[in-house]
Amino acid sequence: MRTSLLPALLLAIAPVVAVASPCQQGSVFEDRNGNGRRDAGERGLAGIRVSDGTQVVVTDRQGRFQLPGQAAMVTVVKPAGYRATARADGLPDIWRQAGHADTDATGACRAFALVPEPRAPQALQALVMADSQTASQLDVDYFRRDIIEPLRGRHGAQLGMTLGDITNDDPSLYPALVVATTSLGVPWLHVPGNHDMDVDATSDADSLRSYHRHLGPDTYAWEE
């Protein structure tokens, strides 16, 4: 009897394709010391809304949530009386993206941390910018010098937002723009425009790949 080694060899040399873990379930907790980690004694928060951009669910008594399907992007709706902790780049830590160290082996999202903020202002002031449409690092420098720096230390806002077009078809500029806007010291949100899409995308679903990775969800809610 002759045994063929070809199938085994083909399996051995076949490339291994990494599959992004879905972010389908997780938890929201009260981060009383604001360190972004769930420490002993920090309770789960009930009644917090979480969304995948289509479905909205509410956390249970232990602060846990379960979405009905596998989600590539999950966001927590920051409620009034709380603030979101900051990500490493300074943006508010309100989203989880599958396959980017935001999920564990079981598919659970990294827990969302919300910090109590009982002295929230009665009236919200926000900085809203639109169509910065930077096309180069030089444009980013102009944006920082002429728009951001005059505001630094001189505004009374509690929230900031940039409306698209954030760049002029160059997603590589997102990190530099984030450095500029987060220097104003308020949570900063973004809304994409038609010039914020990946021009090499092969489908509509993939067209905001870079935006999602650097700036977060394109569908979300924020409460004050």
Where are the regions a protein language model picked out?
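Bacterial N-terminal signal peptides
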Residues: 7-15
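Beta-strand-rich domain onsets/edges
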Residues: 15-23
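N-terminal active-site segment of His-dependent metallophosphoesterases
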Residues: 23, 95-174
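A short, amphipathic beta-strand motif
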Residues: 24-30, 63, 112
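Structural motif
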Residues: 27-44, 117
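Short, acidic Ser/Thr/Gly-rich low-complexity loop/linker segments typical of extracellular
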Residues: 36-38, 44, 51-68
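A short, solvent-exposed loop/turn motif at the edges and junctions
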Residues: 52, 73-101
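Extended active-site neighborhood of metal-dependent phosphoesterases/phosphodiesterases
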Residues: 172-224
